Amino acid sequence: MMVFGIPIDFVLFALTLLGVATIHHHTLKVALIGALVITLYQLVFTGFKTGAGVSGLLGHAGHEWVTLANLLGLLLGFALLANHFERSHLTDKLPHLLPDDWKGGFLLLVIVFVMSAFLDNIAAAMIGGTIASGLFKRRVHIGYIAAIVAASNAGGAGSVVGDTTTTMMWIAGASPLWVLEAYIGGIVALMIFGSIAAMKQHDYQPIQRDDTPGEHVHGVRLGIVAFILLAAIGVNVWFNLNAPDVLGQFPVIGTAVMLAILVTAPIRSPDWSLLPGAFKGSIFLLALVWCASLMPVQHLPAASWPTALGLGFISSVFDNIPLTALAIRQDGYDWGFLAYAVGFGGSMIWFGSSAGVAISSIFPEARSVWAWLKAGWHIAVAYVVGFMVMLAVLGWHPHPINERAAAQPAATAPAR
């Protein structure tokens, strides 16, 4: 069913996002009502991607539960991890470890970029957001928040273990070297959006060298933070290399983070009182992710570099997992370009990637499409420039991809 040529599903999702942006005191209710209305609409009228009726709904839920469970585990886990990190007092020392001008903020974005090559981009973004919150005395410019998300997404775009979309391509038969090309665009984009965002942040709230007298870094809590991060990185890399199918069947990364927190709790207990608030915020975010997963995307234009460029903009609004699955089934892409587009493109709007959705739990003010676009305009510019540099340096060279797993690519990788 259409309204002025637009599927009603999209209209309902747009109304939900409009409600979230305008009814600030009832965002959870708006998100839940939106998710319920879209679900009921597809249940009664259009059916789901996995079929019609209740069986289609159950099939879709079965397909998405790993995504949602991973996100829930990471959101709750990193709320506790952030508290460990804050109580370690390392953020009080960071102003003396980083340059105290705009280059300090830029270096933090580089760190997030590098982390995301090995770590889930949600985790990398939340770590970056936690550090930024302490480093800038909780006064973080929305343009810089957007840059943290962009750095986490760009950092994973060239690694087959750094992003679900690239993992899907790898499982389907793409060479890791094909995907690695995305780092050319990613690094160019980072230089552009990173420097602009860091300068904006420095003008808004500079890094201040003002250690609290007598404070020292609590090594035990910092060690716990490192252990939790290593657990997340370790299981992500190990399963990607040895048993990638498991990642699509069980929320491995979210579970690893929560288990690491429980194992270390007897050594230093986290602030468990944070969980109710974190859970409420997580339900809001999961409702939006569920809505995005329901958006109908049935086919793509012919594979070409303009199509790949356009997919980056599309992925800022719609889930990049089904977009990637469609591209794999379609075949005929230069997979480095596609990895860059669908991996980095979602950074242009706050709900365009799981990293953006997750970081809004730290910075609720980021949940505004207009504020994100206005303050983070440099991300869209950087995306296009990075893509064009790739095109000029590498040229467009489509590779045939092994179709052995393309029939079910989205079911063999964790959601991002």
Residue spans for each PLM region:
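Membrane-interfacial loop-to-helix junctions in multi-pass transporters
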Residues: 5-10, 67-71, 97-110, 136-146, ...
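Helix-loop-helix module between adjacent transmembrane segments
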Residues: 78-83, 111-123, 150-159, 185-194, ...
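Long, contiguous bundles of hydrophobic transmembrane helices that form the permeation core
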Residues: 190-261, 403
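Transmembrane helical segments that form the transport core of multi-pass membrane transport proteins
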Residues: 228-333, 410-415
